[in-house]
A protein has these predicted regions:
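Conserved acetyl-CoA pyrophosphate-binding loop and the N-cap/start of the following alpha-helix
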Residues: 89, 93-101
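Terminal substrate-recognition subdomain of acyl/acetyltransferases
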Residues: 2-3, 141-147
Length: 147
């Protein structure tokens, strides 16, 4: 991980409903698709959603989105839904800073554990998640349903 001055100039910041204007400039590949204003407003307005941005010179260069899952029979947990850093700034410590920030926010909101999944062939993501010191769980099957 080659941290450099560009990465040091990046601000890591949790965002909420009042921060929608920050999404006016988003670097390539930070999100999987275009940010839609109505979906962004709904996401940021949900009390169990957490989003942390990496900002450089007013541009979103990274993000992590997470959801708090509340259970009637188990401790609350944080699901890391999406992590993205623009390719020009990857492998410079920004992803780790985003994950550290979202973990801290999850802890502060009562979560006792966090979990994340990624594709087996996504080696950069797997390397990052491994460096964060998880307990690797056994493989599971995921199912997707169109509603």
């Amino acid at each position: 991980m080659a941290e450099d001055r560009d990465a040091e100039a990046v601000e890591i910041r949790a965002v909420g409903p009042a921060d929608r204007a920050l999404f006016a400039r988003v670097a390539p590949e930070v999100f999987d698709g275009a940010v839609m204003p109505e979906r962004l407003a709904a996401y940021l307005g949900s009390k169990d959603h957490i989003m942390v941005l990496a900002l450089r010179d007013g541009e979103v260069v990274g993000q992590v989105a997470a959801v708090i899952h509340r259970h009637p029979d188990m401790p609350d947990e944080l699901y890391i839904d999406n992590l993205g850093v623009t390719p020009a700034l990857q492998r410079r410590g920004i992803g780790r800073r985003l994950m550290d920030a979202v973990f801290a926010l999850g802890r502060a909101r009562g979560c006792e554990e966090a979990w994340v999944a990624t594709e087996f062939d996504n080696r950069p993501a797997r390397a990052l998640y491994t460096r964060l010191g998880p307990v690797e769980d056994e493989p599971v099957a995921f199912y997707l349903y169109e509603l």
